[in-house]
Regions:
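ATP-binding N-terminal substructure of ATP-dependent carboxylate-amine bond-forming enzymes
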Residues: 1-77
Length: 77
C-alpha cells in the first residue's frame, strides 16, 4: 500500500481523494498555482507545493513541475 500520494488535481475531486486517503492512513501532497494557494485542497493536504503560475498552462499542465514535486516530496505515487 502507498504511504504518501501526490494529488495532481484541484478542487472538489482533490478534496475527495484527500479525505479518502486520510481514512486509509495515506499521507497526501497537493500541488497548487499561485491563485490556488488558499484553496480547500491545499488546506486539507498533509503537505503542499506551490508550482507557481497564474493559469493552468503555466502550472498544472507542465508535467515537469509535477514530476519535480513528486521527487521532492518522496511520494510513492
Amino acid at each position: 500500500m502507498f504511504k504518501k500520494i501526490l494529488i495532481a488535481n484541484r478542487g472538489e475531486i482533490a478534496c475527495r481523494i484527500i479525505k479518502t486517503a486520510r481514512k486509509l492512513g495515506i499521507k497526501t501532497v497537493a500541488i497548487c498555482s499561485d491563485p490556488d494557494l488558499n484553496s480547500p485542497h491545499v488546506n486539507l493536504a498533509d503537505e503542499y507545493f506551490n508550482i507557481g503560475g497564474n493559469t493552468s498552462a503555466e502550472s498544472y499542465l507542465i508535467i515537469e513541475k509535477i514530476i519535480d514535486v513528486l521527487k521532492k516530496s518522496n511520494a510513492d505515487a
